[in-house]
Amino acid sequence: MSPTPAPAIVASRPILAVLVHVPDPEAAVAWYARALPGSVRHRLPEPDPVHYLDLGGVMLELVPCDEKVASGPAGSVVYWHTPDFDASFAHLVACGATPYRGPGDIEDGQRMCQLRDPWGNCIGLRGPAIDRE
């Protein structure tokens, strides 16, 4: 008997949502809305409210940290693409993010770095450096 084929996981939009664990989701969604201009802010109702931002079809969910998942830099890092690395890096720092790794130059004229949000979570940033000379 042949095994049942597995359903396709990777679709045209493989990433649906990213969860960021924070001690104060309301404060975090306000910060991320300022840090990620153009995002659309949502809040699902009680009893367990969920705060999230819609970033062009990818949901950034700000959820309470707990005994299973703490806030902070451990684990995976999601890298966000930007068309202007230097301007986006400066904007995030102005919003209160702290540089953690980099920035550094990588292949094909791209730059990348990791920053920490005010709760210690890592934000990966990647994109081209724009020559302003």
PLM features: residue spans?
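N-terminal beta-strand motif that seeds the catalytic metal site of vicinal oxygen chelate
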Residues: 1-29, 76-78, 127-133
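Core segments of cupin and vicinal oxygen chelate
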Residues: 9-13, 19-60
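Residue-level marker for the onset of beta-strands and adjacent loop->beta junctions
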Residues: 16, 48-49, 76, 109-111
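Vicinal oxygen chelate
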Residues: 22-26, 78-122
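Active-site beta-strand termini and strand-to-loop segments that position acidic
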Residues: 53-57, 115-118, 128
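Conserved beta-strand in the GNAT
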Residues: 61-63, 114, 123-126
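A short acidic/small-residue loop/turn micro-motif
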Residues: 68, 107, 128-132
